Amino acid sequence: MAVSVFDLFKIGIGPSSSHTVGPMRAALMFAQGLERDGLLAATASVKVDLYGSLGATGKGHGTDRGVMLGLMGDAPDTVDPDTIAQRLEAVKASRKLALLGTHDVPFVQKDHISFYRQALAEHPNGLKLRAFDAQGETLRESTYLSVGGGFVVTAGAPNTKVLSAVEQLPHSFRSGNELLALCHSTGKSIAQLMWENERVWHTEEETRTGLLKIWNVMQSCVARGCGINNPDADGTLPGPFQVKRRAPQLYRALSGNPELALRDPLSMVDWINLYAIAVNEENAAGGRVVTAPTNGAAGIIPAVLHYYTRFMPGSNEQGVIDFLLTAAAIGILYKLNASISGAEVGCQGEVGVACSMAAGALAAVMGGTPAQVENAAEIGMEHNLGLTCDPVGGMVQIPCIERNAMGSVKAVNAARMALRGDGTHYVSLDSVIKTMMQTGADMKTKYKETSRGGLAVNIVEC
């Protein structure tokens, strides 16, 4: 499987890539399949079953909303977040849902979407969609797996996405060691290798434009989260806990006191925290975000990239592009050899992976060698090993928002530590990726995005 930078960084909506974006894409694929095969007009009803982690935390993660939007023909990267609540309320009031926006079927959420804690054999995040005719006969039944980061595969089918391109990649790699060997043999940086690989799928202009669009969405997300031209940011987050959004107040405090940087050399940490919190509060509110590589960890790469552009002398547009390409190369290693799904390996696969990606990318744009970049990425994951995914109330809020801030600061520290060395280190990135996957396999299910362990059972829902 060959993976593009645009597979790792996808524009979508919150609060979850695996539980909102993935199911939305699956439902859209299902509805489009009905239309493609001439079954849409004969469809009299649809039924959706959510399994495993989707069933356990799907309500808090917006899985039901994502599925409904997908059935209605919406895609994560184009749906208008500001219209979602109104449109779903219209479905509730009319008790009808328009498949692909054109074909009405009866739809009552509690009757047509079912939640099951029992997981499917293939993956903890499974969903089954069925379409029936007027006589109740099954027209189509499809089972999908949301495997993390918005990636969706059909259960029982090989993942054939871009397999034909593997041998065509000018710089094919599956491990950190192979990546370093390519850098050594070609004399190119990791970003340069990724840039040349992207030409298999995109022109150079398409790649540059696409990456800058990703960066633009990240910047817009931070701005909205800070309350810039977004009065809603001063309120509370959805859900029973009424968590107060903190980013706007923090933004006003920091921007209103610029001389603080002269008195407190660590004031930049406050800004890094702000950037991460702003993104993840927007994510928790269902706003527009970039999976990086997941929604639950969407604040780390934007926060560290904002740190680079704001605080690093000589930062420029090319540096932003190199940052994203380097981060994607590291993310690909986790995607190919481990997991980026909290339901499969815990939060080490989300915040841990994002921290590793950001650390390596920052080291690269700070002038690090490929060996130092690999070292930074390894440090970023090594000290997230064993991190559990225990969202309180099934919401992507506590501890997720603060955890992104902590992961962002940790990524900056990992990059700086690596740059103080020569790239020689005992634990390789490949070893830590393997260890992360093994640790995730050993982790009890209650600590893997089921809200049945950890903080999720020790915080009383009020």
Spans of features found by a protein language model:
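N-terminal signal-anchor module of multipass membrane proteins
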Residues: 2-13, 29-30, 45
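Conserved phosphate/anionic-ligand binding catalytic regions in large, soluble enzymes, centered on
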Residues: 9-27, 284-304, 347-355
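Alpha-helical support elements that line or immediately flank enzyme active sites
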Residues: 18-35, 302-314, 359-367
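Short, mixed-charge aromatic SLiMs
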Residues: 45-58, 90-98, 324-337, 378-391, ...
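C-terminal regulatory domains involved in ligand/effector binding and gene-expression control
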Residues: 76-260
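Accessory "access/gating" subregions that flank catalytic or transport cores
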Residues: 202-346, 454-462
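Hydrophobic alpha-helical bundle architecture
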Residues: 315, 326, 332-405, 417-426
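Extended hydrophobic packing segments that form well-structured cores
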Residues: 426-462
